Amino acid sequence: MPRPRSLSGWTMAVFGLLAASLGTVGLAAPDALVAVMGLAPIPGARRAAGDHTTMFLTASSMAALNMGVYYLLAALADWRPFFRWTVPFRLLTCAVFTSAVLVGRAPEALLGVGAWEGLGAVVTGLALRHERRRPGGGPLDRAVPAS
């Protein structure tokens, strides 16, 4: 079975596996995903008419599954430019989710998701920096997906 070939690849693989797993849980059992986030699930029978929560859970779960698969494939190809591109966007996600909680637009449970994104970005960024500084590391742009 293929495995990531670099420290930064491993950070991406772990993040990808978690994202794909949580996306799958959200598609198969949305209330279980809500509970994992520390929120109280509301059974479908008690939802108000016009409540589109399950639609948004389905959409975000599908996005998480897709993103997780992209991250896993990039990790297996050791596609470091992709790893580098994710760092600022994951930091942005952390900032947006944290801000949403601070202004009262989202429950505190979203802080965990923001922290996960922020920590993942920092760990991946540090791994990329370490790899670039070691002998023979060279520019990250040299790394291209394996054929």
Give a label for each model feature.
Residues F89, W116-G118:
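Residue-level micro-sites within transmembrane alpha helices that shape
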Residues S21, A95-S99, L119-V123:
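Transmembrane-helix signature of multi-pass solute transporters
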Residues G118-R142, S147:
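Membrane-water interface at the C-terminal end of transmembrane alpha helices
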